[in-house]
Amino acid sequence: MAGQRGACTMSDVVERSLEGPLALTTDKSSQKRGDLVEILTGEKVKFDDTRLSLILQNGLETLREENALTDVILCVDVQEFSCHRVVLAAASNYFRAMFCNDLKEKYEKRIIIKGVDAETMHTLLVYTYTSKALITKQNVQRVLEAANLFQFLQLVDACASFLTEALNPENCIGILRLADTHSLDSLKMQVQSYIIQNFVQILNSEEFLELPVDTLYHILRSDDLCVTEEAQVFETVMSWVRHKQSERLCLLPCVLENVRLPLLDPWYFVEMVEADPLIRQCPEVFPLLQEARMYHLSGNEIISERTKPRMHEFQSEVFMIIGGCTKDERFVAEVTCLDPLRRSRLEVAKLPLTEHELESENKKWVEFACVTLKNEVYISGGKETQHDVWKYNSSINKWIQIEYLNIGRWRHKMVVLGGKVYVLGGFDGLQRINNVETYDPFHNCWSEAAPLHVHVSSFAATSHKKKLYVIGGGPNGKLATDKTQCYDPSTNKWVLKSAMPVEAKCINAVSFQDHIYVVGGAMRALYAYSPLEDSWCLVTQLSHERASCGIAPCNNKLYITGGRDEKNEVIATVLCWDPEAQKLTEECVLPRGVSHHGSVTIRKSYTHIRRVVPGAVSV
């Protein structure tokens, strides 16, 4: 079984073997291409026809379709499938055991198959004879269960990979249950990891309350559990116990030991934990309460598994101000990380290639593009760094160079969609371009996607619900456009949507809640676009123009950084738009004005902190 799981499919072997021309040769380097011929002596040759396996496979499928030479009929529901015993036995250990041992099915012409429907059986038989199977959202569970039953292990793995890619907060518990039922350990581990990373979005689902105790235990004990405060973990445990209180109250002590009670706010611990009726009637948890009390009373001197903060409690959501240009046209190498909640600044690594002793050797990062994918920051292009692409790893605080762009550019944008990075449009030094490149992080390679409808630079771009949006920009050096271009990766096509209220370039956009917010250029306003309604609205007026400013969401608010006003003076203020209060306020003042910079949001380990005071001129 292990050997089957790791083996290549027949079609894989054929594809590789047919890559080169067919030739009769004694060159050993070519022995793996086409039809292989090795001269052993002057009188002997060894012939290896690598195409024969494909011919056999196609021939067997044709025989099945024509019902020729079949020797067994599989009866599923009311449908019958004529097959060849030898093919079934060769492909599946289940059928090998059935036909090669002294079982009654070995001698029967018609065999009734239970536990699978006819449509799924047809899918498995097509796979058996062709090594191909169509897996969809509608059939993946049935195909997985049947493949597991008949021991088509590679098909099981394919279904598991499909489910892993389809994970979301609504279906992950169901997929976890499926993995547990069929002992799919690898899939189970991946789903548990997904739940740990998306804990807050998942814990409110009804299915979460049905988790078995061992699974809940594994999730809650993880250091990587993604919560902002331990109170969320405590409340989850109590909700889970109350859901089936009569049978779960006895499990409270073992589950509660995974809650880091010492890290709770002392007021919350007294008012919400110690006062909870279920806690009070369960003496077995009292030692855990005592540990938390002593931790608070001793000045945090007690050390245990429950006094160690989770990884995400060391992190904070921050927005980064990356590079750019100052009032005297000096290029900024620093990356400023601001935490609005804690009013603090985090020091991070300077931009790459900017720390040479000679100033003339340093790269000048300006009019580049940046985006965040999986908490890593990607930057690309720029006037002096046209083909360069780097990513910032926040866990090690370093920039790492990755594969170059195929087409160098600046005044472009980067957007993340479907786990890939898109580089859109821009200026190549001669003209505005409509080229779109897509980066695959797994293979570290770029490929082309459908080009933009309109060649633009200095535009705004973002992704929203499985589509890309390119807004405004300059089709040439003098003009601006109001066009909204929308890309659907499922069709690889661009279409035009409702135009912006004004023509604008040197603008930026961000997807936030149900809208796309656009700011910058000469607009003196913050606009919002609704992809659902395909309509625009004015959000709020600005006191000045903010051409080439940055915008980023952070802690459920929007932050507008820097830019240039109508006098071409750089701006140092950071504005905050609060959607709940519908209010625009000044958050703080940067050490220096900056424009043409990047602005993104990440979660950053909370180390090397310096204070930022509202209205201060430096940090």
UniProtKB/Swiss-Prot annotation:
Keywords: Kelch repeat, Repeat. Disulfide bonds: none annotated. Residues 70-137 form the BTB domain. Expressed in embryonic blood vessel endothelial cells but not in the vasculature of adult organs. In adults, detected at high levels in hematopoietic and lymphoid organs. Disruption phenotype: Mice show impaired antigen-dependent germinal center formation and B-cell antigen receptor (BCR) signaling. The number of mature B-cells is reduced. Involved in B-lymphocyte antigen receptor signaling and germinal center formation. Kelch repeats lie at residues 318-365, 376-419, 420-466, 468-514, 515-556, 558-604. It comes from Mus musculus. This is Kelch-like protein 6.
